[in-house]
């Protein structure tokens, strides 16, 4: 096969070169990082002043490069650099950068770094404000260091800094997620003593903690208290409590809570939405109580709330796992489509995928082919699952014929290059030369890129056939 063809098929990432612009940006980043890293190495006290004198433009790439250069014995300086960078008005750390800092500086494994830095601020009489301490607390949050976060919170007064609601929320969330709800509750009471009020984030953290601990009564009590501090009880909070109830297995109580949401319709604020109903439907389906799940779907429809794709997937899988017959599945799909929100294509595609995952291939293939006969376009996910299954069964010719039908329907497929390669290789191995050439031409038209290993195997398979016509077809642009 010509080298030019192999070059077109091989993934561009294996042969592309960085552009001049990318190289220039890289050099600029390295230059700034070198200057900042040099300040870190040469400074013995008040590092922040030295860093400010470098006068460089900071971005995430530069910060990452500086941290990456730090040796383990420089992690404390690296942490101070990261905190300083976050206090600048021209830069704000992303969640990704907090994660990177925790990973590079190994803060989870060496939590004492946090304490060393705070103590060094105090000894060197560095300027520390609320923003500085928030960044430290956010690092604790990212590293799941609840005890260290509480220690930092207690250090606020030493720098004449008053902790705000954001600072308390960061610590409360850590203890709530950890399951230490006594300390979290103590901190909420402490907020009241220092003139601060819990906000929606505070309550949400606590409610999540109570739900995770299975303390639904406490979660519900706290939700009712939200209004006392002008916090709106919304559908998100209700849904979280409802999810906790469903996980506990108390479905009767879940229905009671759902009824309360339906009754206390506050202009859409606490009215159940598709996510809320789907939580209850899924819980019933998991317990194989499909009839009750369908009753919840009826309630959903009666309130004018349309099911979404997730609702449809959950119900269809529930019906199939309950060994219901085809008539029951058809009835469900008709109801879902009539309610709106999901199409016939989405429902049939979901059924196909569910059946394949349940190892009920023959039924899945029948439904998939029925879709094509009825003129219903399957979605890309269903196509990918069907083609992959046919290739596993080595039914390459059947797979290719279906592939042709799908191409005619102009389906936006998620069929990846690996499936194309396996299908092409299988067609070659089984002597289906004409079909292989047609598939190869389609792949080239789509500018599809293959792994080197796949290209080599296909070339070898083509050689074994000895079909010169196929070789020439495969070489066509």
Swiss-Prot record:
What's the domain of life for this entry? Eukaryota
Q: Which Pfam families match?
A: PPR, PPR_2
Query: Cystine bridges: which residues?
Result: none
Q: Where are the PPR repeats?
A: 129-163, 164-198, 199-233, 234-264, 273-307, 308-343, 344-378, 379-413, 416-450
| UniProt keywords, alphabetically | Repeat
Cite the InterPro entries for this sequence. Pentatricopeptide_rpt, TPR-like_helical_dom_sf
- Record has Repeat as a keyword: yes
Gene3D superfamilies from the xrefs?
Tetratricopeptide repeat domain (1.25.40.10)
| Family to which the UniProt record says this protein belongs | Belongs to the PPR family. P subfamily.
Q: Please report the name of this protein according to its UniProt entry.
A: Pentatricopeptide repeat-containing protein At5g47360
Q: Which organism is it from?
A: Arabidopsis thaliana
